[in-house]
Every structure is written in structure tokens, then in C-alpha cells.
Amino acid sequence: VGSEMCIRDRLDSLAAKFETEDFIKDDPIQFLHRFNDKGKEDAELAGFIASLFAYGNRKMFISKLNDLFARADNDIANYVKNGDFANLKGMEYRFAKDYDIIPVFEILNKLYSSSKGLEELFSYAFKSENFLQTVVDYFYSNAPKTAEHGFYHMIPNPANGGAMKRMNMYLRWMVRSSEVDLGIWKFMQPKDLLIPLDVHVARVSRSMGLLNRKSNDFKAVLELTEKLREFCPEDPVKYDFAMFAFGVELNKEKLGV
């Protein structure tokens, strides 16, 4: 128990140190803050779209997102609702080509035409038996028959057992309220969130003895989130910042910085 207390204290201090406004400028959450002044729909759409591209090299995907939002005249809610996505032709990032990206926008257009949009979809799904699967199934049921790997990489299927890192990160942005996270969705509480698990968070968690599972999959997400709930039941995902910070510090030690 003593060593667990030490770990918790270390995580708490790292989380407090890194979860500050200064974190925003180099993180994809910058797009939610940029669009939040325009309104809730703009922030939730900017966040959802940013989360789809948030993998690989951070500088690269942030630059790609700047390009994408510029094509949308930095008016993302109106752009989605207007439904003319011709100027996304030629847009691509790693696995996603324009013929993968445009269908996502077309589905979002349909969602906002027929409902209150992403908040309504996610809140409806949250009440269902299988939260993330219900969200994803909406996109799959409206996907073109020609949808290819790039589309399914942007919106992965939870049934495959993956960590669903980007969707859990999006939920962190939208549900937690802090200097960094917006907290504009109220249908769920921070205690309901799951840790966004990537290779860095997984490596740090294992090195601290918080995660035993060897695969970085959904079962690992549940195991680690349960452990973090022991430290902070009402807000386990705040430790995402601590894990990130710890990973950065470990790298510095390796590099001798």
C-alpha cells in the first residue's frame, strides 16, 4: 500500500504540473479551444474531427488539421451543415485518403440534419448496452458500400477489441472540465470516462506496475482505468496528463537532457 501511495502522489503532482493552459498549444485539443468561441457545435465537431486524425507524428497531424479547417473556412459547423465537401478533394493523411474523409463529413452532415448532432448521438449511445459500439454503428450503417480501410481506420470497430484511444480521448476533451478539457457535455460524468491508451501510456503504466496485461487493447484500457479509479474514483482520466508527462520525462532521462 505504501508504494501505491507513492505512485499516486507522484501521479497527482505530475497531473497538476502538466494539466495547465500551456499544454493546449502543442496538443490537438487546441482546435476545440479555437472553435469554442463560435459555439458548442463548432467545438464538438472540431474535436471529433481532430480526434480522427490524432495519430502518428503530432506536428504532422496538427498541420494537416490546420489545412482541413482552413478548407472549411474555419467555420466547421456551417461547413458540415452545408454539405458541399468538394474542396476536401486531395485531402489525405497517412491511411486516410479524400475518399475516406469525405464520407465521414457526409455522415456528419446527415447527423446534424436529422438530430442535434454528436452530443445527441453520444448521449443516446451512452444509455445503450454498448456505448462506443452504438456510436460507431451509426457511422457504419451510413457508410458507403465502397468504404475502404482508411475510413475504418478513422472510425475503428470496438468489436475488434482495440483500445479506442482516439474516441476515449475525444470523450475526455468533451466531458472533463479543467484548464485543458472543455467539459461541455453533461450527459456523463468524468468518473465514467476510460483512459485513452496509447503505446506511451501503456509503457509508463507497466513500468509503474499499474498495468499487467501485455496487449494494448480494450481489456488493458479497462484494467488500467479500474486501477486509476482506486486513486481517484471521481476523475480517473486526469492521470492521462501524468502518464504523458512521465513519458516525456523518461525520454529526457534516456536522452540525457
Residue ranges and their predicted role:
Residues R8-K252, V257:
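Charged interaction scaffolds used for protein-protein
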